[in-house]
């Protein structure tokens, strides 16, 4: 079998062979350290009884490692120029299918049903996500309720910090809540910028998201819950009252009544959003939802 793709020499050889030029608009940075790939598949707990969806295979470095350890791999690639390269670099593996398309526009459940020979096997999602589209992809996968046991992503370290953050830290925010509401989040390890070609400006990190059996808190209306959390972080230095009154002007004439009701459930409107944990945000949104419906 040919030398691993994830080395500086082999990557350069492949790119030269096909005259491939990186597209900055697609955030293309290819891994050139096979040790990192092994750590990613170990973190994702890939086995021969696992199906994997990969997003953004590039020239196939991570795909190759996944193919060695998984039952089947289906990879979404948006850049048509990479399709013939992937045909070449992954030709030794009969358990890989590459789907040309944008995962943000795809019906992922349909792809699972059509592309995997055994769609009933446990599914995991693994990706080296382009920085510019990280958040939209993760939120789409969550909101579409894709039946994945876990998701393991390599992404910009700053975003990984935000996803895995805890309350009362500068990284904690609406993105933290949007993901941790459904998933347990663990920052697995840091990936230095030096192991990519071309080298990005910042370090990356691998984050492992494991689906909770039930959402972290009980809410009456999930859409409204996320609306409240986003509003609470609209201006981080402002209090809950300032942010919520700006988002929901109907609260202003009833401030005293609102303060009294929220104090009764242990939430003080002079706090900042970053100090509330997810169960507290659930209590806040449930109360607000009922409060705003009252005449």
Curated annotation (Swiss-Prot):
GO BP of this protein: rRNA methylation
EC nos: 2.1.1.182
GO cellular component, one term: cytosol
Source species of the chain: Listeria monocytogenes serovar 1/2a (strain ATCC BAA-679 / EGD-e)
The reaction(s) this protein catalyses: adenosine(1518)/adenosine(1519) in 16S rRNA + 4 S-adenosyl-L-methionine = N(6)-dimethyladenosine(1518)/N(6)-dimethyladenosine(1519) in 16S rRNA + 4 S-adenosyl-L-homocysteine + 4 H(+)
Listed name of the protein: Ribosomal RNA small subunit methyltransferase A
Function field: Specifically dimethylates two adjacent adenosines (A1518 and A1519) in the loop of a conserved hairpin near the 3'-end of 16S rRNA in the 30S particle. May play a critical role in biogenesis of 30S subunits.
Pfam families tied to this protein: RrnaAD
